[in-house]
Swiss-Prot record:
Pfam families (UniProt xref): YbaB_DNA_bd (PF02575)
Self-association and partners: Homodimer.
Keywords: Cytoplasm, DNA-binding
Family per record: Belongs to the YbaB/EbfC family.
GO molecular function: DNA binding
Compartments reported by the entry: Cytoplasm, Nucleoid
Full protein name: Nucleoid-associated protein Daro_0807
Record organism: Dechloromonas aromatica (strain RCB)
Keyword flag Translocase: no
Function: Binds to DNA and alters its conformation. May be involved in regulation of gene expression, nucleoid organization and DNA protection.
Assigned GO CC terms: bacterial nucleoid; cytosol
Amino acid sequence: MMKGGLAGLMKQAQAMQENMKKAQEQLAQVEVEGVAGAGMVKVLMTCAHEVRRVNIDPSVMDDREMLEDLIAAALNDAVRRGEALSKDKMSGFTSGLNLPPGFKLPF
């Protein structure tokens, strides 16, 4: 009886792993936009942190220091949005597991 239960658990774990892999592949294609300076700088990136496009309003081109800050802020905004989306998508797979707070998957 124990052997059958263990086999069932292993099968469930394998199915969860396959589903997580599919979800990660899908998330790698999902795009999120980070914005800073009331839209003066926009960054489009995937949830896999691949930057696809950066849009900069011409009005901020003359102030290098401000532009650098806005680019960093827009990138950070996009990363946060991507991580939140990924967390929501992956939470369905980990809802039954007792993982410590802040634990990130995949390992």
